[in-house]
Swiss-Prot record:
Gene: Phf5a
Protein family according to the UniProt entry: Belongs to the PHF5 family.
GO molecular function terms attached to this record: RNA binding
Pfam families: PHF5
Originating organism: Drosophila melanogaster (Fruit fly)
Protein name: PHD finger-like domain-containing protein 5A
Length: 111
């Protein structure tokens, strides 16, 4: 996700003992490079990103987490798993634009 959207910002604080989770939509993806091949290292996130209502949420989109997140083998070899907490902090311009477009035209989500 972050590889294809350069405006997304990672948390990058010191990771704690909390394990990152992924939702059904992102299940099996590498958190850094979005590949589905060779999951290797378990994702650790900082305590701030796992506090309160954020506990058990998806690292990429913030949805309810269903499985553990992993870094792929190539990201582990390049030591991208040591860069800090990989949780995405901001929404990004594409999601905010979608929100305001829906609001402008009056579309509502029916649950």
């Amino acid at each position: 996700m972050a590889k294809h959207h350069p405006d997304l910002i990672f948390c990058r604080k010191q990771p704690g003992v909390a394990i990152g989770r992924l939702c059904e939509k992102d299940d099996g993806k590498c958190v850094i490079c979005d590949s589905y091949v060779r999951p290797c290292t378990l994702v650790r996130i900082c305590d701030e990103c796992n506090y309160g209502s954020y506990q058990g949420r998806c690292v990429i989109c913030g949805g309810p987490g269903v499985s553990d997140a992993y870094y792929c083998k190539s990201c582990t070899i390049q030591e991208k798993d040591r860069d800090g907490c990989p949780k995405i902090v901001n929404l990004g311009s594409s999601k905010t634009d979608l929100f305001y477009e829906r609001k402008k035209y009056g579309f509502k989500q029916n649950y």
